[in-house]
Amino acid sequence: MVLKFSLHSLHGGVKNLDEIHKRAKRAEELGYDGIFLGESHLSSIDSFQTLASCAMITQRVLLGIAVTNMVFRHPTVLAGAAASLNEISKGRAILGLGTGDGPVYGQGLKATPLKEFEEGVKLIRHLVQGNPATFPSGNVGIGFTISKPAAIYVSAEGPKGLQLAGRSADGVILGTGFDLRVYEWARHKIRAGAGEAGRKESDIAVIAAGMLCVRGDGNEARRIVRNRIANRAHHNFRFTYETVPPEELEGVKKFMAGFDAMKPMEDRVDPDLVNDYLVHRFSIAGTPEECIERIAELRAAGVDHLMLTAARKVYHESVEAFATKVMPHFQK
């Protein structure tokens, strides 16, 4: 099985479009399969417009939003934007959706309730497939050419979100990390949701997501990602502790109690509370050889697409080393 490798958050910490374009072009040159941008509308350049511009300078890579929400953008606006990006990129767009995270809470707003969120996912998917939807004013659909439907993914970590994705989405961006036991648990929830909607598990693509750091010294790599995974881990455990082994539960609860979402990213938690379990679960960090061993285990478990967020501190070094020393082992 040939694995797909995508990069996430190319625009993290980047203040100008030229640098993002350089990163996008280099990702394609190195053989990555996709580039994904998160959306934080005041702290980062607009993701939809940025990806549309990246479509003009790339030929092959998937262009994904991972993720946006329905708090700031109405589902019909998202449908139109996704369909537009897919036309501009000639079928390479993926729209990743979540209920709302940092940018939403930071403005004192609330995440979209799951029932409303699922209705929105279904509406967006319905519209990008070229179908009209019924509104008080009558039937309304996308009025421009849709050569191919954009893929609609749901970012999910908790059991309800995973089942929702199985019922309603084309794919799942799996934020539960790279623990094989958790991966099997998540697939079970997705399978259950798919069954509720009369779908097959194979109908839903799964992208496993986490942090990346490749260094000559594996311990250094794990030190670098320790703070950066804190936000990811905190987001995950807000939904459930169900996936935490009993022997790790006390440490995870201490981490959650010590996390302050209102502080800057690097200062939200004492690094000593980000233990080895969290680093291992939410990152692929180490020497090239250690990364190869880890990914081989994931592939054997059925993982076929990884979305990796390179640590900002060593972004270029990690992206280059991973592409030249790790990826070739899985692209034969």
Residue ranges: model-predicted function:
Residues 3-9, 35-37, 63-66, 93-97, ...:
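Hydrophobic faces of well-ordered beta-strands that scaffold small-molecule active sites
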Residues 4-18, 68-75, 146-157, 212-215, ...:
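Active-site mouth loops of central-metabolism enzymes
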Residues 110-142, 183-300, 331-332:
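An alpha-helical appendage that flanks or caps ligand/catalytic pockets
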Residues 34-57, 69, 101-104, 176-180, ...:
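Glycine-rich, proline-tolerant flexible connector loops at the mouths of alpha/beta enzymes
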Residues 48-68, 72, 123, 127, ...:
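Alpha-helix-loop-beta-strand connector modules within alpha/beta enzyme cores
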Residues 15-27, 78-81, 156-167, 225, ...:
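Short, acidic/polar
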Residues 1-65:
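N-terminal beta1-alpha1-beta2 module of alpha/beta enzyme domains
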Residues 31, 54, 85, 124, ...:
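Conserved, mostly hydrophobic/aromatic
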